[in-house]
Amino acid sequence: MTQYASPLLQTLLDTDAYKLHMQQAVFHHYYDVHVAAEFRCRGDDLLGIYADAIREQVDAMQHLALSDAEYQWLSGLPFFKSDYLQWLKTFRYDPTQVQIRNDGGKLDIRLSGPWREVIMWEVPLLAVISELVHRYRSPEASVDQALAHLEVKLDDFRTMTDGLDLSAFRLMDFGTRRRFSRDVQQAIVERLKLEPWFIGTSNYDLARRLSLTPMGTQAHEWFQAHQQISPDLANSQIAALQAWLDEYPDMLGIALTDCITMDAFLRDFGPEFAGRYQGLRHDSGDPVQWGEKAIAHYQQLGIDPLSKTLIFSDNLDFAKAIELYRHFADRVKLGFGIGTRLTCDIPHVKPLNIVIKLVECNGRPVAKLSDSPGKTICHDKAFVRALRKAFDLPQVRKAS
């Protein structure tokens, strides 16, 4: 085995909360749906040389299982039903669902299988890739360096917020998938826990062990899969929003808006959805324009924006979060999710810009168009054209 072949992942819960939240909904509503997903490196990194080391980690993941203590903890949360948790106790990663190869220097990964199982691969696999690559590239970087740099940023934060009322400022860790390492993420979260404005983490394992609130609702794949689950493409986003409420009628009500674009989302987000969902999450496009559109939409529907929450999570750092807080704080409730800029922010370390996105559902194409053209993902140009037509969208450039 290689130098770093000891398993990087120690628990099934070392993943983002929305994966379990979506998995339960899939378990209850779409048990037999099959999907395929693919890895993308949005940067110019040639990661193919790590394919064998990644395969070793993937093979080791089949031994992860929910512990009795973890099961009891999940049982005490309001989100989960007993039939799902009983099934989750039996869940094991199936490495045969993951194809990994070095394609001329580029890392090529494809996941396929039942959605209820494949849904679990994305976050831990990205975290493994990130940690492996950084171990090879930056073996001298340390937890202490990460913490020291965080203190510099916190000093800057205190300076830029001097005299600012932070009573409504809420920040959470969204940094699992592109973290420098598991140890760095834990150290960063433990330090941030001391701050009054830090409210939780997307990582279920850290939430359990550090007594924090697990944060997260649904991801793009929830909306993408409905493009093929729904009999009518034009109503697929409505179907996704309704199915989520069927599973979670009065909780986990933050809706992601940019699978098809914000404008298309708001056309589907009518009075009932806007009333029942607790808020919206921004993940692409201009955040100020997006927030203004959201507030105007609520106002047009006769809903007080201060009764709703806007979550910002697109490439945030402390400075961007405070800029948005200053702009919106007196008009709507706010939350800020910072990922890479928390958990992989060490001097001289270049974070990876890597994603895994759904590309097929039941053997047919799905797409993410988003409010940032460079984030658009789909192989099938004909399907993208059909999607644009169904949602009355302008031309959107496909990402390479």
From Swiss-Prot:
One Pfam family per UniProt: NAPRTase
Catalytic activity: nicotinate + 5-phospho-alpha-D-ribose 1-diphosphate + ATP + H2O = nicotinate beta-D-ribonucleotide + ADP + phosphate + diphosphate
UniProt PTM comment: Transiently phosphorylated on a His residue during the reaction cycle. Phosphorylation strongly increases the affinity for substrates and increases the rate of nicotinate D-ribonucleotide production. Dephosphorylation regenerates the low-affinity form of the enzyme, leading to product release.
Residue numbers carrying Phosphohistidine: H220
One of the record's GO cellular component terms: cytosol
Pathway(s) the chain acts in: Cofactor biosynthesis; NAD(+) biosynthesis; nicotinate D-ribonucleotide from nicotinate: step 1/1
Protein EC: 6.3.4.21
Biological processes per GO annotation: NAD biosynthetic process via the salvage pathway
GO molecular function: nicotinate phosphoribosyltransferase activity
Top-level EC class as recorded in UniProt: ligase
InterPro entries for this protein: N/Namide_PRibTrfase, NAPRTase_N, Nic_PRibTrfase, Nic_PRibTrfase-Fam, Nicotinate_pribotase-like_C
Keyword tags: Ligase, Phosphoprotein, Pyridine nucleotide biosynthesis
Function statement: Catalyzes the synthesis of beta-nicotinate D-ribonucleotide from nicotinate and 5-phospho-D-ribose 1-phosphate at the expense of ATP.
Family, similarity comment: Belongs to the NAPRTase family.
Protein name: Nicotinate phosphoribosyltransferase
The gene coding this protein: pncB
